[in-house]
């Protein structure tokens, strides 16, 4: 069976390590990137089955801008995006920005950090299996 590929883009090394371990233990092929620049290079070269994206990295809008660019790309727009954030109420703020400009950005799922391993695996399965 072909292992599903997941790319995680987050500027928190401990989150990358923990999340990777959870997913690899469930037989997913995982790669990580600590910046949107590195993430874009891996996204284009590897074409993962799922992207886990921190919405707020080095700058406030880095994750949102990354998702926006991805959704505007013909080649990358079909890859599911799971947004993750440690910011309280980030989901509400994200939803407001999506509601305003629904035509050009969307994520397939949102999860708040800290991530519950069982919830993460459940949501990953919903998106790619």
Sequence positions of predicted segments:
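Two-component/phosphorelay signaling modules centered on CheY-like receiver
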Residues: 13-31
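Short amphipathic alpha-helix used as the core "switch/output" element in two-component signaling
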Residues: 41, 64-77, 99
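His-Asp phosphorelay/catalytic-motif detector in bacterial-type signaling
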Residues: 47-49, 75-80
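Non-catalytic signal-transmission and effector/linker regions of two-component phosphorelay proteins
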Residues: 1-5, 112, 116-129
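Acidic catalytic/metal-coordinating carboxylates
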Residues: 14, 34-38, 61-68
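Acidic, metal-coordinating helix/loop segments flanking the phosphotransfer/catalytic sites
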Residues: 32-50
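Alpha4 helix (beta4-alpha4-beta5 surface) of REC/receiver domains from two-component response regulators
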Residues: 61-65, 87-111, 118, 122
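Active-site residues of response regulator receiver
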Residues: 54-55, 85
């Amino acid at each position: 069976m072909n292992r599903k590929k997941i790319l995680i883009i987050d500027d928190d090394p401990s989150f990358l390590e923990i999340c990777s371990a959870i997913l690899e233990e469930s037989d997913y092929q995982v790669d990580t990137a600590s910046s949107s620049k590195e993430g874009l290079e891996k996204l284009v070269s590897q074409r993962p089955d799922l992207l886990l994206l921190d919405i707020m990295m080095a700058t406030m809008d880095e994750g949102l801008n990354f998702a926006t660019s991805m959704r505007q790309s013909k080649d990358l727009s079909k890859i599911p995006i799971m947004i993750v954030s440690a910011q309280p109420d980030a989901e509400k703020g994200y939803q407001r920005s999506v509601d305003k400009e629904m035509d050009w950005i969307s994520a397939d799922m949102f999860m708040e950090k800290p991530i519950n391993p069982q919830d993460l695996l459940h949501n990953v399965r919903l998106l790619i299996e």
